[in-house]
Structures are given as C-alpha cells and as structure tokens.
Amino acid sequence: MKQLRLNPISKVHGTVNIPGSKSISNRALLLATLAEGKTRLTNLLDSDDIRHMLTALKQLGVNYQLSDNNRVCEVEGLSGVINSDTAQTLFLGNAGTAMRPLCAALTLGSGEFTLTGEPRMEERPIGDLVDALNALGADIRYLKQPGFPPLTINATGLNGGDVEIAGDLSSQFLTALLMVTPLAKAQVNIKIKGELVSKPYIDITIALMAQFGVTVINHDYQRFEIPAGQKYVSPGTVLVEGDASSASYFLAAGAIQGGEVKVTGVGLKSIQGDVKFAEVLEAMGAQIEWGDDFIIARSAPLHGVDLDMNHIPDAAMTIATAALFATGTTTLRNIYNWRIKETDRLAAMATELRKVGAEVEEGHDYIRVTAPAQLNTADIDTYNDHRMAMCFSLMAFADCGITINDPDCTSKTFPDYFAQFAALAQ
C-alpha cells in the first residue's frame, strides 16, 4: 500500500484555483446530453467520477470532444432521450453522481441497460429512487440485493403523475428525478417524505436545469412540480464552478496556519451551498473575506462550535478535523447521510480522530470532537474515500505530522490535491 508522509508545516500562504465541481460537472454533462444543440462545458473536473460518466455517455452513443487537458468538453445533444438497439452494460465505479442520474435518465428512452460498479457501490442505497421511477412507469430490477446496485433497466419512457420520495437519505435521489421528469409523458408532482438533506445540492440542480431552459416549481422543498412538454435547450456555454467542497481544505488550512490562503473559482456568486463552510470557519474564529469568485481565510484562535450541518455534509467533514486545532468541543449534528457515502464516514472519522488523540463521541447522526492537549502522529486509513484523505492532510499543522495511507484515493475528485496542498507551504 502506498503511503504519504506529511511533515509538520508551520505556515501556509498563497492562492489556489479550485478545480471544477464534481456535482456540477456530472449534472451538466447529462443535461447537455439530453439537450437540443451543442454545449461547451468549461472548467470541467478531470477526475475518476467524471471519467466514469464520460465513458458511459460514449458507450451510449453520445458524441463529444474533450480537450487535451480534459477541462473543456463539447457535447452534441441528443435533443431528447437515450435510445439503444443493443443491450448495454455500464460500469460506473463508485460514482454516485453518475449512478443515480443515469439510472433515472435511461428510463426515458428505449433499450436494456445494466448499471454496475465497484463493491462499495453495491452497498450504497438506490432503492428510494428506483421505487419512485417504477411508480412513474419505469421497469427497473435488481440483480443482487434489493435496494442496491447492480440493476437492469428495461426502458420504455416515464409516464408522469404523482410520486413520493424520501428526503432524509441522499439529495442525489431527488436530483436524479428532477433532471429527468421534464421529459416524462405527463406532469410529475414529487412529494418529499421527511426532512430533505443537502438542500443546497437541489438548488444546484434546479439552477442548472434553468440554464438549459427547464422550469421546476419548488414548494418550500416539500413538493416539486415539473410541468410536462418541456425540453432542454443548450445555453451554448456552461462554466463549471470550482468545487466548493474541495475549497474547504484550503480555507481550513488558512484558518489554522495562515498566513493568508485565497481560493478562486468560488465566492459570493457561487450556486453551491458548500461555500457556507467559510461561515462555519468564521463562527470558529477565523478571519474570512469574500469576493464574487474568491474567498480568503486568515488564521485566528479557533474555538469549538455546536452546529446542524445537514445543509453541507461533505464540507462538514473538514470541520471535524479542523476541530483538532480548536479549543473546547465541536459537535456536528444531523449528519446521518455521512454513513451512506463512499464509506461510513461517521465511523471512519471517529476511528481516525481517536488515533491522533482526540476525544470522540460518535452518535447515530452526530459526532462530538474534543482536541487533546497534544496531538499524536498516526497512520491514517482513508477507506478508499477521497474526503478522508484530504481532511486528514490538516494534521500536517500538528507538531508531529501525519502519514496518509492510500493517498491516491483523492483521484475521485482532486488528483493533484497533495501537490497543491504542499505548494501553500513553500
């Protein structure tokens, strides 16, 4: 197993241009596919999850041209649904942002499609989405465990009508439904059961759909109306914002050990909810400055916070490790959906924080972290989870440094993360 030793870093300073958002990249690729006309996507993320989506689209007959650096993609839209005369099997790795939306999109046209992935993908639930699609007239069947991939879709189109979907597991289920229902045969009305997690990710979806000319009526995140008879039309060019979740590590670095760290590609005009991570750092005591397309973090003494993090669960992970450098106790609440991500992130985070000496209480849907008087070095297991690796890079600001096991797992969203992180310490 590959290991990366991070020696102690006493100061960070500099500017980081954040790579494109994973969430926006894969949504935009799918909408460009369904749209009328050619769409030019700029600042596309170059990572494993995006490659899985691109490979699947090519296999499905979608024509696109990718630039040499993989950051610009011109997609020739299908002016509607995906059809296939031959049975297709698509391997989607551990990319939830490809698996869930493609599962929904492939029900719209005609053909037989089998969706598979890595072993972890077979543990990530998809049942609520499948139930909703089947209720709208789809024919989706599980090949192994009910409620989980792999699965087979016999596509004949979506009828429309009323449907319910659970809101408390993953916003990706609702995102997938929202993106495909404008192309159903009749109006679709979606009712949300329970509290909707990660509402800002739904805002991203609706904003992108609007860019492609499609309307969703949002009744306070409890009910969504998607009128029939709509079509996606290319807006010409779509700029993919920097990934706000990826920005969180650099902003935390500035807050802990700045200097001054400036991240560009996200800011006041961002459509991503994870930019609110900077407000959490501010609540902990950091100095934050905002621009339309940048955020600056400067260090100040940090103290613990007690917050509901349901709206920004991915970025919330960074607060769990930033808490190692704060006085007092930090409690992150309403984060059950950490458990169904790339790994069970609640259990993994608790285990690894204890290795470095933190006092940790792991609840069903919360984590409580108290920093020790002295942090310990350790070999941090990353669980094939990019965010675990990036979160624990912050331990380089301890006097003892840290070793990251399997650092290349960051290729899922940020292949050159550790090089960019090291550059701030020069």
Swiss-Prot record:
Recorded metabolic or biological pathway in which this protein acts: Metabolic intermediate biosynthesis; chorismate biosynthesis; chorismate from D-erythrose 4-phosphate and phosphoenolpyruvate: step 6/7
Signal sequence annotation: none
EC assignment: 2.5.1.19
Top-level enzyme category: transferase
GO cellular component entries: cytoplasm
Keywords: Amino-acid biosynthesis, Aromatic amino acid biosynthesis, Cytoplasm, Transferase
PROSITE patterns, sorted: EPSP_SYNTHASE_1, EPSP_SYNTHASE_2
A GO biological-process term: chorismate biosynthetic process
Active site: D314
Pfam family, one: EPSP_synthase
Domain of life (superkingdom): Bacteria
Binding positions (phosphoenolpyruvate): K22, G96, R124, Q172, R345, R387, K412
Subcellular location(s) per record: Cytoplasm
Gene Ontology terms for molecular function: 3-phosphoshikimate 1-carboxyvinyltransferase activity
Amino-acid positions noted as binding 3-phosphoshikimate in the UniProt annotation, renumbered to this chain: K22, S23, R27, S170, S171, Q172, S198, D314, N337, K341
Catalyzed reactions per annotation: 3-phosphoshikimate + phosphoenolpyruvate = 5-O-(1-carboxyvinyl)-3-phosphoshikimate + phosphate
Primary role: Catalyzes the transfer of the enolpyruvyl moiety of phosphoenolpyruvate (PEP) to the 5-hydroxyl of shikimate-3-phosphate (S3P) to produce enolpyruvyl shikimate-3-phosphate and inorganic phosphate.
Family recorded in the similarity comment: Belongs to the EPSP synthase family.
NCBIfam families, A to Z: aroA
Quaternary structure and partners: Monomer.
HAMAP family, sorted: EPSP_synth (MF_00210)
Identification of the protein by name: 3-phosphoshikimate 1-carboxyvinyltransferase
Organism whose genome encodes this protein: Shewanella loihica (strain ATCC BAA-1088 / PV-4)
